[in-house]
């Protein structure tokens, strides 16, 4: 499957308010195809690519800052394992309240995982556009731009979000938000919930992109690691989809 189709699928699986924040892959491809070798064409491409990278970076930073604030404030539920255990214990007879606690945690975790996949697929998209540009023009933009993204752009530096994902998963495990021994019907019910469903679908798309990509080298991202959660890991695809 071509990368453009997988990107389209990833965009459709993202949150609605995120869908205009992805790399403008189709438009950038059109600009590359129209380059005739003139300085004006090259300048137009560089300007369009820079604007797209700025858009991606600003959105990632905005979301990361929001997640840090939510994580520190532990809202809408205090993400503290002891408090969470106590809340669930007190709500043992209130199924709706327990379900609400679980859903809030799963949603927060899912939004952060979606941001990690957003970072990955946009970096890959930028890399593929640069590769197409260099192939068409004989230029050498890919290496310096990839280096600049890795060193200076926020959307490639995912350590903070990854740490919060791991901490959230630890709370989920301790509080038995969705136990490993949960029945299949419980997993299926969770998968039908909006953000959780989108998260699983986005992870599967990213696995397809990573496993099937023919683009490997010093400018490639490291392999995507799925969150260490049995209930997400169980949704991994059995085989890769080839990327063109």
Swiss-Prot record:
Superkingdom in the source lineage: Eukaryota
Q: Tell me the Pfam families matching this sequence.
A: SPX
Please report the stretch or stretches of sequence annotated as the SPX domain. 1-147
Which chain regions cross the lipid bilayer?
A: none
Name the InterPro entries for this protein: SPX_dom (IPR004331), SPX_prot (IPR031142)
Q: Which GO terms describe its biological process?
A: cellular response to cold; cellular response to phosphate starvation
Q: Where is this region: Disordered?
A: 212-244
Q: Which PANTHER family match?
A: SPX DOMAIN-CONTAINING PROTEIN 3, SPX DOMAIN-CONTAINING PROTEIN 6
**Protein name, as recorded:** SPX domain-containing protein 6
What phylogenetic lineage does the species belong to? Eukaryota, Viridiplantae, Streptophyta, Embryophyta, Tracheophyta
């Amino acid at each position: 499957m071509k990368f453009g189709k997988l990107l389209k699928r990833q965009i459709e699986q993202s949150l609605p308010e995120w869908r205009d924040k992805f790399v403008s892959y189709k438009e950038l491809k059109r600009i590359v195809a129209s380059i005739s070798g003139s300085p004006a064409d090259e300048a137009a491409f560089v300007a369009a690519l820079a604007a797209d990278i700025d858009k991606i970076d600003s959105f990632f930073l905005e979301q990361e800052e929001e997640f840090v604030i939510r994580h520190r404030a532990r809202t809408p539920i205090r993400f503290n394992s002891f408090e969470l255990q106590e809340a669930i214990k007190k709500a043992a007879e209130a199924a709706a309240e327990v379900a609400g606690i679980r859903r809030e945690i799963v949603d927060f975790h899912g939004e952060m995982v979606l941001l990690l996949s957003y970072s990955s697929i946009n970096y890959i998209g930028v890399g593929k556009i640069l590769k197409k540009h260099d192939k068409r023009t004989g230029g050498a933009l890919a290496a310096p731009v990839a280096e600049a993204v890795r060193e200076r752009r926020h959307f490639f530096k995912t350590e903070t979000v990854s740490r919060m994902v791991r901490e959230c998963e630890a709370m989920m495990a301790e509080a038995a938000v969705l136990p490993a021994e949960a029945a299949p019907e419980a997993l299926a019910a969770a998968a039908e919930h909006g953000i959780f469903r989108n998260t699983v679908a986005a992870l599967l798309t990213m696995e397809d992109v990573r496993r099937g990509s023919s683009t490997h080298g010093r400018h490639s991202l490291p392999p995507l690691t799925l969150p260490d959660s049995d209930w997400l890991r169980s949704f991994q695809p059995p085989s890769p989809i080839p990327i063109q």
